[in-house]
């Protein structure tokens, strides 16, 4: 299996190169040249396997230059009870008849990013060894909150790596900020940016592809890579949990093998829902992919109209991990939907860079409307949904998951579709305690974040994750705030270039 760049179909590399580079030299994203298939018999054969074994089975289809031993080394180390608070790794909870929550937040940082970022360091260090690179790998991360902490936790003290995380100073929750700024490890760095997530992401991409910076790194015996979902090594682990959850639903008798399900994903950067698209096109019977956005609803408008327009007001919301107006992974989807037309991709994304806007052709619009349904939910709707779920079903969810539930309710109201549905629950309610409490116990005001965590615990009976409880006594190590234009200098200075 080779990987191509979305901006140069003639470029072909193996998965180890795609993972170690993170992004193609032309600024494109790596995609597998074909989507491997998984048959119903294969899905059935996974029923009695552990999550780690299911993951290894899926990875073997995509990472064909890795040996079985290398893949199992990665999966065995990443997906274990030493990293996750459940041996199932991801849990499925029935919310109400035929609607299930896929809980992806049982890892060390209490967000779905752990599902990929616990294994990415093993993928990356294995790739570097396979390629005999003999270079220190410098991981640059732009984060809207969850990726940063999950990447820091995954890469801390990993030999031969250094990681730097940039986050919008006013664009993450207080718990997310505390998680990042207290990070332990000798090879980690964290810096706040005056601006929003898109400023962080655009400048990280710019630093990545700057030839002069690349040359300076090369001379110093270093090379960049990415832990964002622009890196294929981040995206492919997300495909696994959609494959695995279908198998679990069938094994538990909730569905029969072959039955279609809908999948609802709250998303800003489009990676999590793109992983579900890959699972569907491998052979997992997924009917509709439902894309849930907050008021930064650029994806909703795009899926409905075929026009991508980031020229709009940016809102800081209670679901900050989705406060994004430039959805990087959309480039991969459009490459697939245009039958790998790299010229169209370069044209559209050139227009996005220059004008902040592009419109896809009618063929792509047609497929978008067939495969996807999109909706959005504002902060008030999010708050009401958290309360409704808590009151009706005694289930406590975070803000991002609430957005997904509300959009799914809108989908059902519009379509009447009663297909059984899996909703991706992307973060622990404890990561957004203030917003959760504002919904379910508005009298709880004036508390600090740790009192809020304790109050959520009293109301929900969900165990407080140890990693969050321990934050109270940790010292803040990283307090620097810079402008987006200072990011490149910060990187160079941090690396001693």
Model-derived regions, located:
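PLP-dependent amino-acid enzyme catalytic core
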Residues: 1-497
């Amino acid at each position: 299996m080779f990987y191509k760049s979305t901006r140069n179909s003639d470029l072909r590399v193996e998965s180890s190169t795609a993972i170690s580079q993170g992004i193609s030299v032309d600024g494109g994203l790596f995609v597998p040249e074909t989507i491997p298939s998984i048959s119903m018999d294969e899905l059935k054969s996974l029923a009695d396997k552990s999550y780690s074994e299911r993951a290894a089975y899926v990875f073997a289809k995509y990472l064909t230059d890795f040996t079985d031993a290398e893949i199992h080394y990665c999966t065995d180390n990443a997906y274990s009870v030493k990293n996750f608070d459940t041996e199932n790794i991801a849990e499925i909870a029935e919310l109400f008849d035929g609607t299930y929550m896929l809980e992806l937040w049982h890892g060390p940082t209490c967000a779905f990013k752990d599902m990929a970022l616990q294994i990415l360091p093993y993928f990356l260090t294995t790739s570097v060894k396979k390629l005999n690179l003999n270079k220190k790998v410098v991981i640059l991360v732009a984060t809207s909150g969850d990726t940063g902490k999950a990447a820091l936790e995954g890469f801390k003290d990993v030999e031969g790596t250094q990681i730097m995380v940039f986050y919008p100073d006013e664009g993450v929750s207080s718990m997310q900020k505390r998680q990042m700024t207290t990070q332990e490890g000798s090879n980690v760095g964290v810096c706040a940016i005056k601006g929003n997530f898109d400023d962080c992401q655009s400048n990280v991409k710019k630093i990545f592809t700057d030839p002069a910076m690349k040359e300076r790194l090369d001379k110093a015996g270093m090379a960049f890579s990415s832990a964002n979902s622009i890196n294929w090594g981040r995206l492919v682990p997300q495909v696994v949990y959609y494959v695995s959850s279908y198998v679990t639903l069938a094994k538990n008798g909730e569905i029969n093998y072959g039955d279609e399900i809908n999948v609802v994903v709250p998303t800003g950067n489009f990676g999590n829902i793109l992983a579900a698209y890959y699972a569907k096109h491998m052979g997992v019977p997924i009917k509709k992919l439902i894309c849930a956005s907050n008021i930064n609803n650029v994806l909703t408008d795009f899926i409905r109209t075929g026009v991508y327009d980031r020229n709009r007001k940016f809102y800081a919301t209670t679901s900050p991990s989705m406060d994004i107006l430039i959805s990087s992974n959309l480039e991969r989807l459009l490459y697939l939907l245009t039958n790998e037309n790299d010229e169209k991709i370069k044209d559209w994304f050139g227009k996005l860079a220059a004008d902040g806007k592009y419109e896809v052709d009618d063929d792509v619009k047609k497929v978008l409307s067939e495969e996807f349904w999109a909706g959005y939910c504002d902060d008030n709707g999010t708050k009401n949904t958290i309360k409704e779920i808590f009151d009706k079903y005694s289930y406590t969810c975070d803000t991002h998951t609430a957005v997904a539930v509300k959009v799914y309710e809108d989908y059902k109201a519009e379509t009447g579709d009663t297909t059984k549905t899996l909703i991706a629950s992307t973060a622990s309610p404890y990561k957004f305690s203030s917003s959760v409490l504002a919904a379910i116990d508005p009298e709880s005001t004036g508390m600090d974040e740790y009192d809020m965590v304790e109050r959520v615990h009293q109301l929900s009976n969900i165990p407080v994750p140890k990693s969050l409880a321990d934050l109270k006594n940790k010292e803040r190590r990283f307090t620097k705030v810079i402008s987006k234009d200072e990011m490149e200098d910060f990187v160079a200075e941090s690396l001693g270039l």
